[in-house]
Amino acid sequence: LRFFTVYGPWGRPDMAMFLFTDAIYHNRPVKVFNHGKMERDFTFVDDIVKGVDTILKGSLDQRKEKGEFYKLYNIGYNKSIKLLDFIKEIELNLNKGAQKEMLPIQPGDVEKTWANVDALIRDYKYKPETAVAEGVKKYVSWYLDYYK
């Protein structure tokens, strides 16, 4: 299973969601790489959990009959979101503007990621559904409650 840019409550403090939210909340600059020309397939953690659960409940016997002892599935929202739009959602939910520190792209990074979930939909009738606006709202609500 390949997960794409997972975010949500209890996320790692070294990941973008926490770093951006915490910086904006505390009036610190947000480091924005590639001068904001980045896109990511942001996937809410609840969708990842549901995807893993759905796959684990799938029929092992059916896969064995097909000779499929392993298969690769992407779990992602199936849509790239501009990094600056993601930051705007955080700003909206915190009711604060971000101080953006525009930086060059980091070595080895890519400008865009996107999860093709066609196999997941075909084999398991599952597609992550949490839109970024909804997921960011849930995350910021959790953050404000947890760090009050």
Segment roles from a protein language model:
Residues 19:
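Conserved catalytic helix of short-chain dehydrogenase/reductases
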Residues 22-148:
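C-terminal substrate-binding subdomain of Rossmann-fold SDR/epimerase-dehydratase oxidoreductases
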Residues 1-15, 39:
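Flexible, glycine-rich beta-alpha linker
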Residues 2, 15-16, 115, 127:
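Short, conserved clusters of charged catalytic residues that mark active-site
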